[in-house]
């Protein structure tokens, strides 16, 4: 060991001496003595490795307390960090889908702080059913006889099939054998549920007679799957639920539908493309309809099944129901969200998903113009900051073809180098509240459709 190396090792402080420093008092109070000591030992080992490999001290050796604070602050950050979603996708699966209404947030907080009547009947002091209150709400909204709630729509489809068709055949159009994110495929779910898939028709055309010819003594269900995340256009043919229900009654086979996104209001009244609604399918005579809670409905992640009382009873008594049931926080948020639908005149104000989807392009354009000047002043040396028209999408497999006119702030590097865009996007992801946009066509786009808190946005980007 050289004299220089020995000198560097001698400059490493003892842990006891560091802990006596006043700058470590607040760190020990915040993070605990044990964790601070563990990190200091780790940092000393790192410093020794740097000395051994490069004959120098790490730069942070000049201020140990500052480095410890920085590392422990980063370590303490939640894995679920709030972000500003400016991707242009309103229901972004990777960013948690639907924002919750204030009523839902308050309901969850109350359910977490206190014991609640999850499965307790106050009238007779006996055991209640956790789905009962929500089932009543869902029946009121959809016109169904009963309802069942599980933890997501994939679970709803699995339970629906396992409880009503295990060991039997389920007839589905070939054009409706969907795959959604995470490799969730209808044929795979059927196998897990113990069903045999009997596909009929072709990818683009399926007729009533295709279903009729497929039905046999082992047929349990006729199934419709709403192709919410893709669209088949051109020379196509599909029969709707009402026609399939009529055929099912003739052949004594119930009809079930996986609706996917599931909107409880007619979106066309807000100028949005119309999606099929559970209440329409119930009115048409479908026995069971499943849909998501955290997509167009605007609530928490949940799988909702509405339909005929006898069919729902089979789901409730199936062993999978307990494995897939929703917890009290989910039920609290979902109940609060559903209650908003009882007052439809205020829905577009109180339900964040609908509020964001219905923002007009003109309003967003004005917002973009208001924000352009301070951002151009801050970033103008490196980037041209412009207001550009763009198209938002709903996301989460909802209305895949339709786009919503919007406006964006775009950042274009003066030197045209894409690496500068990547660097800027990375810097924004490292902010205390990360700002998430998208890089496209030589620009970094910030679609402002989902931006409601302008002050926080500017605080982050003008740092």
Swiss-Prot record:
Record key words, sorted: Cytoplasm, Protein biosynthesis, Pyridoxal phosphate, Selenium, Transferase
InterPro entries in alphabetical order: PyrdxlP-dep_Trfase, PyrdxlP-dep_Trfase_major, SelA-like, SelA_trans, SelA_trans_N_dom
Gene3D superfamilies: 3.90.1150.180, Type I PLP-dependent aspartate aminotransferase-like (Major domain)
Main EC class the enzyme belongs to: transferase
GO aspect biological process, one term: conversion of seryl-tRNAsec to selenocys-tRNAsec
Catalyses which reaction(s): L-seryl-tRNA(Sec) + selenophosphate + H(+) = L-selenocysteinyl-tRNA(Sec) + phosphate
Pathway(s) of this molecule: Aminoacyl-tRNA biosynthesis; selenocysteinyl-tRNA(Sec) biosynthesis; selenocysteinyl-tRNA(Sec) from L-seryl-tRNA(Sec) (bacterial route): step 1/1
N6-(pyridoxal phosphate)lysine modification, residue list: 295
Subcellular localization, as worded in the UniProt entry: Cytoplasm
Keyword Isomerase belongs to the record: no
Superkingdom, natural source: Bacteria
EC numbers for this chain: 2.9.1.1
Cofactor(s) needed for function: pyridoxal 5'-phosphate
Any single GO CC term annotated in Swiss-Prot or TrEMBL for this entry: cytoplasm
Major place of residence: cytoplasm
An example Gene Ontology molecular-function term: L-seryl-tRNA(Sec) selenium transferase activity
Described function: Converts seryl-tRNA(Sec) to selenocysteinyl-tRNA(Sec) required for selenoprotein biosynthesis.
Xref: PANTHER family: L-SERYL-TRNA(SEC) SELENIUM TRANSFERASE (PTHR32328:SF0)
Record's subunit section: Homodecamer; pentamer of dimers. Binds only one seryl-tRNA(Sec) per dimer.
Similarity annotation: Belongs to the SelA family.
Name under which the protein is recorded: L-seryl-tRNA(Sec) selenium transferase
